[in-house]
């Protein structure tokens, strides 16, 4: 039985984990587009009647128009959408007057679609027509739609252009609002299509292009056409290549990405096509039966009401498409060519009579909503509803959902709202001794502002009644609106918890019987590995031997053994350059494949290449319409190569490596703790996307680099090579900057016109930060003497040191010149000279003081004493704001890469308004505390303590001059990290993060360097 459980436990753990992942993916798919919780109060209110229908009644007789509109109104529709075609000197104002008058008489609202056969060529004349139309009907029409399907060549009149349509909106939008101050201007309904031009443009892409061209300010609501095509409204697949009702969500997501989430998204045409109802059917819109058409239509309305608070009016296509019985759009029609009602309109009328105005759906609703019933005495305006001073002040609001909130105007006044839901106290409000739930309207800070207050949640699905009684608060316009939330009915909680329980139970059993489970897994892995190894070895061997035959005509692996260092370094460098500079995707991919093979053969060289390209992350490689940092690509390739080596050699791991993996050093534990806390901090981030990105590129990938240095067998030569390549990368940064400075390009003018070098970085301060990490290493290694170093190599270190120092000097980085570099040089002197360090230290101190005195009048130095406007003033304000930020979130911090949003949105001092876009605290202690909380600060302190303890022990005990000076250089670099980090960035840039992990990983590896390791 025990053996059976040992066999079943891994299977149960894996299966339950897969089930959990599948459930979460399905849940994400199901709720996509569904606004969870209470909708944002900035969202525009939903129309009380959200259903409309397209009509084509202009050429009809007055009797037919009146009869048709009366039938539409009696069905329960609140809107009709009519297209008005304009041609120069050919518009029929009389017919338009007649139609609009009948619309108003039948208690309907009209969406007036203004369009023409060739709008782009006559924008000014068309704009004049739109102004005249809005001016003429401003008392009868409030909703105007400019054009229709501009993403199709057939509607736009020529190749579609989002820029042209954006310009049209920019021209006409202000004219309509000038003529009709209550107007709602709709963007043209975008036709759903998967084409990407040139004749037709994907509706999702077209909307993205509209926002990119600046159209956001020139429409009040967006518009799409969520036809169902061949599937029902509960087809929840979402893709640019899929046409279905859910495609509407993709348009909404584009709006949110563009920061336009406060507007509603209207459906100017939607429905399902029944080809049997058309004399001349088309397959363009898919095909369903009449029964499906009815059921799908009602289900779509239900879904939009219950899931999409951002959905505006849904306009069916159509009541009837006109007098032409051969029009293929009869397949959408609610009536037949003979005038009889179809099945859809009959069932729809029954549905609307019950649900249309019975309860407020998911969304935002204005104070004057028809779902709200007020006692006598209330006043209403654009500000909301004002509490009466005399008499009752009650509100009854009927809604359908699981959450309810009030949008109120709070301020420096005394008022109380007493609320009950379904005759019970509201579960999110405090309760008086009398058992009444209440909400105080006095603002905590006494400022006047509009706020959404959650009232109740976890309500049963269905209709609910909220009763509100106000005590005081008149003349404040306290009630602004109502917010209704509706949690998804799709609940996976119990199944997920069950699967999680099985997963944890199986894992617990495996841990308890770890030895037996490990034996079983090792047997299984060896069984499959023996069979997979043959295939992998055969494939890789073929590639290697073909490459050898085509290039050098000799055994490729022999070229990569440690006795021949030039070939692997040269080939790897050439492959890296080919990947980076190649304009052809195929060559880039082939180069990446070659690099993967090379990294597999020599992972130690991979580490050196990563160290080399660290500062060049700002110049990513474009592939697959994305940008990839070379540092990131090389790190992931090296990780993949090491994993491949371990998988292939799993059955023959040496005892040393196995035991090493089981013995984590204190520094390893500190780094893993830091990474874990960083991952956890994502949960506290308001800007989740920014936090995840920073975790990936500034925490996870640098930690991967640290782990690679720790697990790859490395010799002393390998460690020195990694540090040398790190110095070479910094040297290249310095050379590029010096050339730019000589040519007078890519410079920044500081105080009094001082030109500052910035090389490849966006700021001169980044030059000082990065070169400050590499300069101590170059200086320390230049102190080596023969026979431990050749004259040429020592000269190279000296030249690199001089170039980097000059580059730092020309960057005028005060943090580097006044703190970082002096502190690092002091460390080198004391570590290298020991008891004889006093004299050279005094010389350094004298030189530093002399330079400070000489340059004290320099604008970059003199500005430090400005306590009212200079950098010191702004730093003090920034640090004070950061302390307040930490005080509010001492445990979790504000999350990775959320400093900017928290600082700019809440904590910035009014005196520091000139520079709101600061993304870090400019202090190593405050920065880690603000991002990760005090536990995060403790983790970095643990890392630094362990680092210096290890480094000091190595410096005092090692007998190898090269390793001793390498350790001194790395220690001085870390001291630069601390000193410069007191006033500027420390870790939270990609290059600084990799430099930090490189420094601590090499220090740790020096303690167990393997002089006999070979990366073969």
State what each model feature region is.
Residues 353-522, 526, 530-533:
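Glycan-recognition surfaces in beta-rich domains, encompassing non-catalytic CBMs
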Residues 5-17, 21-26, 495-680, 690, ...:
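Transmembrane signal-anchor hairpin modules in multi-pass inner-membrane enzymes, especially those
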């Amino acid at each position: 039985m025990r053996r059976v459980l040992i066999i079943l436990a891994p299977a149960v753990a894996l299966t339950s984990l897969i089930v959990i992942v599948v459930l979460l993916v399905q849940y994400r798919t199901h709720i996509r587009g569904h606004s969870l919780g209470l909708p944002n109060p900035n969202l525009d209110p939903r129309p009380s009647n959200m259903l409309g229908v397209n009509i084509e009644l202009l050429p009809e007789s007055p009797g037919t128009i009146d009869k048709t509109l009366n039938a539409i109104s009696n069905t329960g529709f609140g809107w009709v959408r009519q297209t008005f075609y304009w041609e120069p000197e050919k518009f029929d104002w009389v017919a338009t007057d007649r139609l609009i008058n009948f619309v108003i008489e039948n208690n309907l609202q009209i969406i007036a679609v203004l369009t023409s056969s060739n709008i782009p060529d006559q924008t000014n004349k068309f704009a004049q027509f739109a102004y005249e139309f809005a001016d003429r009907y401003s008392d009868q029409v409030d909703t105007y739609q400019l054009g229709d399907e501009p993403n199709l060549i057939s509607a736009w009149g020529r190749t579609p252009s989002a820029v042209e349509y954006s310009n049209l909106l920019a021209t006409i939008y202000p004219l309509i609002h000038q003529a009709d101050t209550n107007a709602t201007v709709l963007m043209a309904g975008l036709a759903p299509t998967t084409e990407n031009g040139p004749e037709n443009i994907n509706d999702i892409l077209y909307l993205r292009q509209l926002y990119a061209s600046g159209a956001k300010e020139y429409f009040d609501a967006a518009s799409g056409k969520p036809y169902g095509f061949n599937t029902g409204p509960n087809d929840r697949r979402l893709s640019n290549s899929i046409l279905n009702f859910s495609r509407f969500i993709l348009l909404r997501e584009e709006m949110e990405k563009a920061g336009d989430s406060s507007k509603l998204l209207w459906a100017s045409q939607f429905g399902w096509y029944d080809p049997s109802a058309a004399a001349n059917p088309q397959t363009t819109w898919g095909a369903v039966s009449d029964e499906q058409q009815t059921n799908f239509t009602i289900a779509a309305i239900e879904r939009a009401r219950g899931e999409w608070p951002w959905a505006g009016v849904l306009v069916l296509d159509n009541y009837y498409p006109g007098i032409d019985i051969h029009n293929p759009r009869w397949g959408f029609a609610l009536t037949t060519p003979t005038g009889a009602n179809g099945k859809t309109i009959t069932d729809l009328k029954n549905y609307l009579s019950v649900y249309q105005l019975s309860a407020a759906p998911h969304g935002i609703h204005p104070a004057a909503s028809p779902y709200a019933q007020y006692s006598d005495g209330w006043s209403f305006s654009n500000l909301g509803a004002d509490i009466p001073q005399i008499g009752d002040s009650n509100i009854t609001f009927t809604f359908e959902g699981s959450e309810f909130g009030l949008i109120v105007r709070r301020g420096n006044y005394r008022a109380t709202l007493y609320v009950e839901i379904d005759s019970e106290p509201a579960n999110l409000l405090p309760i008086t001794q009398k058992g009444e739930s209440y909400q105080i309207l006095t603002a905590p800070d006494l400022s006047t502002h509009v706020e959404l207050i959650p009232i109740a949640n976890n309500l049963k699905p269905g209709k609910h009644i909220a009763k509100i009684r106000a005590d005081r608060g008149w003349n404040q316009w306290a009630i602004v609106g109502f917010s209704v939330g509706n949690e998804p009915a799709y609940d996976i909680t119990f199944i997920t918890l069950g699967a999680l329980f099985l997963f944890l139970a199986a894992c617990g059993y495996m841990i308890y019987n770890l030895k037996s489970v490990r034996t079983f897994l090792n047997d299984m892995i060896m069984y499959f590995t023996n069979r997979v190894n043959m295939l992998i070895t055969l494939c890789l061997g073929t590639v290697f031997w073909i490459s050898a035959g085509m290039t050098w005509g000799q055994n490729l692996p022999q070229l990569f053994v440690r006795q021949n260092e030039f070939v692997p370094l040269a080939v790897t460098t050439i492959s890296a350059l080919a990947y980076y500079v190649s304009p052809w995707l195929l060559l880039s991919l082939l180069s990446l494949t070659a690099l993967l093979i090379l990294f597999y053969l020599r992972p130690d060289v991979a580490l050196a290449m990563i160290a080399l390209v660290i500062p060049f992350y700002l110049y990513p490689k474009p592939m697959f319409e994305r940008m990839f940092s070379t540092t990131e690509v090389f790190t992931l390739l090296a990780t993949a190569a090491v994993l491949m080596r371990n998988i292939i050699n799993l059955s023959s791991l040496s005892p040393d490596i196995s035991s090493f993996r089981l013995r984590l050093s204190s520094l390893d534990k500190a780094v893993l703790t830091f990474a874990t806390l960083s991952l956890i901090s994502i949960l506290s981030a308001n800007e989740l996307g920014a936090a995840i990105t920073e975790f990936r590129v500034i925490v996870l990938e640098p930690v991967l680099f640290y782990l690679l240095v720790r697990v790859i067998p490395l010799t002393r030569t390998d460690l020195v090579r990694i540090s040398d390549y790190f110095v070479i990368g910094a040297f290249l940064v310095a050379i590029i900057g010096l050339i730019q400075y000589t040519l007078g390009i890519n410079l920044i003018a500081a105080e009094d016109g001082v030109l500052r070098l910035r090389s490849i970085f966006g700021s001169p301060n980044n030059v000082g930060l990065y070169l400050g990490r590499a300069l101590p290493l170059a200086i320390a290694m230049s102190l080596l003497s023969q026979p431990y170093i050749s004259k040429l190599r020592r000269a190279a270190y000296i030249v690199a040191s001089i170039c980097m120092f000059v580059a730092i000097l020309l960057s005028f980085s005060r943090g580097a010149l006044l703190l970082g570099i002096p502190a690092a040089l002091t460390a080198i002197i004391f570590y290298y000279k020991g008891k004889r360090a006093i004299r050279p230290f005094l010389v350094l101190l004298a030189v530093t003081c002399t330079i400070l005195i000489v340059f004290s009048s320099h604008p970059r130095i003199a500005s430090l004493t400005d306590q009212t406007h200079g950098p010191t003033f702004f730093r003090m304000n920034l640090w004070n704001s950061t302390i307040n930020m930490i005080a509010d979130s001492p445990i979790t911090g504000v999350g990775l890469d959320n400093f900017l949003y928290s600082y700019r949105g809440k904590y910035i001092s009014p005196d520091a308004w000139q520079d709101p876009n600061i993304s870090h605290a400019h202090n190593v202690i405050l920065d880690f505390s603000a991002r990760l909380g005090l536990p995060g600060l403790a983790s970095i302190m643990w890392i630094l303590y362990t680092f210096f303890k290890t480094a000091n022990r190595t410096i005092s005990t090692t007998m190898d001059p090269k390793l001793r000076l390498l350790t001194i250089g790395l220690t001085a670099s870390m001291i630069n990290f601390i000193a410069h980090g007191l006033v500027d960035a420390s870790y939270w840039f990609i290059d600084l993060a990799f430099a930090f992990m490189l420094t601590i990983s090499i220090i740790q590896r020096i303690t167990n360097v393997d002089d006999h390791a070979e990366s073969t």
